[in-house]
Each structure stands twice: as structure tokens, then as C-alpha cells.
Design a protein with these regions (language model features):
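Short, charged beta-turn/beta-strand-edge "cap" motif at the junction between a beta-strand
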Residues: 136-146
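Positively charged n-region of N-terminal signal peptides that target proteins for export
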Residues: 1-5, 9
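Eukaryote-biased recognition of intrinsically disordered, low-complexity regulatory segments
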Residues: 27-58
């Protein structure tokens, strides 16, 4: 019997050794960021050198590296022009100006058009493992066709809001700001996907007073309050309108659980005879089964 078990184990080891390591590592992206390079606005049929998704891959995030370093790494052998100077003007033969006077390359970090250049966003400062960098070609309004319209920057609403688990009620609408997220028992963490109506405005997430990045799993329990803010308050300038953030709240309701909090047991109002009749137990009594 022992020989038979050993033989089966050896056979299993041999089978597992034939499975490529990438199968097991496919979902493990510790220490990496995802880089997507795409052109969805200028069709090849209309003269573009290429269209669709050119790159979608995870690359290592080295200490001190920048968003630009990650983009160059992801492009690999594809050509690019300008990364060393801080502005990419061409990728794989598709250049700024090819799709019109306002065409060129722009990019987001976690779905937000950054307010500084790609070279200035560094690992450990504003760039972290798990982040998503998306480089996109625009042909209209310097980003209006890919989610960043400078003419509507005062719009700090969300266009969409969803979660990896649970049911959101009421159904999401941009002008509704208070929701309940009902989760099944046993769910202890969720991920949020929030899309700004104007991606020039950054989306922030706070849960029970702790800030979380868009790509992070947020620990939750019954009664957790998620606060989602879109935009940063700013006064009007000669070039831009005043910005007033929009805040959404989502309260977690876990099926079958009461909200967590401190248990407050009070004997106020009992007279002395009632108090004398009470039998109090400590934790050790419960363990002994008294």
C-alpha cells in the first residue's frame, strides 16, 4: 500500500513539473505595475499606423523608477520617441499630429490623468505595485475623447461605481450620493471600481478613516462606511473653472450580522436586591463551561 501511495505521489510531481511556471504565477503581480498602450480613437482604416491594444503587460517596479520607465520597459522592442525628454510623441509609428491638430499621446495612472509628467511620478511616492498605467492616443480636444475634457473639469461626479462583491442599492446614478452595499456573510474585503465623469479629477477612497488606493482590497465589516471623493477643491483661475469635489458614501451591510462596535452593558436602574441576584461571569468561567 505504501509503495502504491509513493508511486502516485511521484506521478503527481511529474505531472506538475510539466505545467509552465507562468500558470501558477499568472495572478501573482507582487512588485509589478500593469501597463496598457492603446489607440481606440484613430482607426487604421483612416490612416493610423495601427489601432487597438499594442501592449497590455505587467512589468517590474524597480526602486526609484518612474511611470515613464515602466512604459518604456513595457514597450520593449516597439519604437517610441521622446521618453527621455519626458513627453512621448510617437509609439510604433503612430505620432502626435497624425490624427489631427489636437492628436497625440496621453496617459492615466489608475484612471486619472496625472497633473505632473510621467517622469515625475516615482515608485514609493505616487507609484506603487498593483497600479495601472494606461497610455492612450487622443484625436479630439486634447483628451476629451478618452475621458479628460478640459471644458468640463468642474464636473466632479462619478460616471460609474461598482464593487467586486455584493449588491449596491439603490442602483447607481451620478446624482445619488448615498448607498448601501449588501455583502454575503464571510466577505472581509472588497475592491472598488469608480469612474470619474471627467478623468482629470482624481478619485479618492476612505474606509473607516483609512485611505486606500483604487487598486487595493479594502477590509470591511458590517457597518463599514466607505467615503468616495471625486476631485480636489480649487478656486477658479484664468484657465480653469472652480472645482468643488463630490462625495459619495457607501455603508456596508453584512447579511446576518449586527454592526460591529463596543458592547455597552448597563445595570443602571436596577435596585440593590436585583443587583445582588445577578451572577456575573468572566472569560475563564465561559471556557470552563460554568
Amino acid at each position: 500500500m505504501k509503495k502504491r501511495i509513493v508511486s502516485l505521489l511521484l506521478a503527481l510531481v511529474m505531472v506538475l513539473s510539466l505545467v509552465p511556471a507562468t500558470v501558477w504565477a499568472a495572478e501573482n503581480h507582487d512588485g509589478q505595475v500593469r501597463v496598457v498602450v492603446e489607440n481606440t480613437t484613430y482607426a487604421k482604416a483612416n490612416g493610423a499606423a495601427w489601432d487597438g491594444t499594442l501592449v497590455d503587460k505587467w512589468v517590474d517596479l524597480a526602486p526609484g523608477s518612474s511611470m515613464m520607465d515602466c512604459i518604456v520597459s513595457a514597450l520593449g522592442t516597439y519604437s517610441q520617441t521622446g521618453a527621455e525628454s519626458g513627453y512621448i510623441s510617437e509609439i510604433n509609428g503612430l505620432s502626435a499630429g497624425d490624427g489631427g491638430a489636437a492628436s497625440g499621446w496621453m496617459g492615466t495612472l489608475n484612471d486619472w490623468f496625472t497633473n505632473v509628467g510621467f517622469k515625475d511620478i516615482k515608485a514609493g511616492d505616487k507609484l506603487f505595485a498593483g497600479d495601472i498605467i494606461r497610455v492612450m492616443y487622443t484625436t479630439n480636444g486634447y483628451g476629451a475623447d478618452i475621458g479628460g475634457d478640459w471644458n468640463t473639469q468642474s464636473d466632479t461626479s462619478l460616471a460609474a461605481l461598482s464593487f467586486s462583491e455584493g449588491v449596491l442599492t439603490p442602483d447607481f446614478a451620478s446624482d445619488k450620493t448615498a448607498y448601501t452595499l449588501t455583502l454575503p456573510q464571510g466577505v472581509t474585503g472588497i475592491r472598488m471600481t469608480a469612474t470619474a465623469s471627467n478623468k482629470n479629477n482624481q478619485v479618492y477612497l476612505t474606509a473607516d478613516g483609512t485611505d486606500y488606493r483604487r487598486v487595493e482590497t479594502v477590509p470591511v465589516h458590517n457597518g463599514t462606511v466607505l467615503t468616495i471623493r471625486c476631485g480636489d477643491k480649487a478656486a477658479a483661475t484664468e484657465w480653469s473653472p472652480a472645482i468643488t469635489p463630490t462625495t459619495y458614501t457607501v455603508t456596508v451591510s453584512q447579511e446576518g450580522d449586527a454592526p460591529q462596535g463596543d458592547l455597552d452593558v448597563s445595570f443602571k436602574g436596577l435596585h440593590s436586591a436585583q443587583l445582588a441576584s445577578l451572577k456575573l461571569y468572566d472569560f475563564a468561567d465561559g471556557i470552563k463551561g460554568d
